[in-house]
Regions:
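Hydrophobic adenine-recognition pocket in adenosine-nucleotide-binding enzymes
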Residues: 114
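Class I (Rossmann-like) S-adenosyl-L-methionine-dependent methyltransferase catalytic domain
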Residues: 1-101, 118-125, 129, 137-213
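Hydrophobic pocket-lining residues that define ligand/cofactor binding sites across diverse proteins
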Residues: 134
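A conserved beta-strand element that flanks and buttresses the S-adenosyl-L-methionine
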Residues: 110
Length: 213
């Protein structure tokens, strides 16, 4: 992501978490993933964890969790709220993280609303980073599709990418599935509306559960 787009996104999210009361209840995607992670023995790494609502939710299921976010404001708040030794919050650029060094055991990546918040170059770095890991087991992904009603709104800044109050890059489900299938066994892949309604927003979302080959 170029410096201008990164600046817009950083300012937006720092302001969002500083001034606005973001949802505290676990997301519908976290609830969807519950049956798949309930007895998981590894660590759940929540990329772009925000206020940690899903990270905390998974921790309440007795899972080891690490929440990663670039926002200094929100990571500081999350650290103050945490009450368990089995949950950590780190301020990091997840596209550059050495995930194997962060955990002592196997881990899975939980990525909700993250793929559509980063540009193609950052996505490539992230997947290259993830695929280099020897401890990765599962991917859990939820992201806005190119079929979402917000597609095309705002200033176009790249392929399927637009800026309104912040940056969004809508994901092509066919390309995503093709890319993941090279390295993962797809356990679940679907696109639908109704997954995450919030006031007047009812996005078209892609949901993925995939296991490393």
């Amino acid at each position: 992501m170029n410096k201008n787009k990164n600046y817009i996104n950083k300012n937006y999210w720092e302001s969002y978490y500083s001034k606005k009361k973001s949802p505290q209840k676990r997301s519908s995607f976290a609830l969807f993933c519950k049956k798949h992670v309930r007895n998981y023995k590894g660590t759940i790494i929540d990329l772009g964890c925000g206020n940690g609502r899903d990270t905390f939710y998974f921790n309440k299921l007795n899972l080891k969790c690490i929440g990663i976010d670039k926002s200094k404001v929100i990571i500081s708040k999350n650290k103050k709220k945490k009450k368990s030794d089995f949950i950590l919050f780190k301020r990091k650029n997840f596209s550059k993280c050495n995930f194997d060094k962060m955990v002592n055991n196997k881990f899975s990546i939980y990525s909700r609303f993250i793929l559509h918040a980063i540009d193609e170059n950052t996505e490539k770095k992230l997947f290259k980073n993830i695929l280099s890991s020897k401890k990765l087991e599962y991917l859990f992904i939820e992201a806005r599709s190119i079929n979402d009603k917000l597609y095309g709104i705002g200033k176009k800044v790249g392929n399927h990418a637009y800026i309104t109050t912040h940056y969004r890059r809508f994901i092509d489900p066919k390309k995503l599935k093709s890319k993941l299938s090279m390295f993962f066994n797809i356990k679940y892949f679907n696109e639908a509306v109704g997954y995450s309604k919030l006031k007047h927003d009812n996005p078209s979302l892609i949901r993925v559960i995939a296991k490393r080959k």
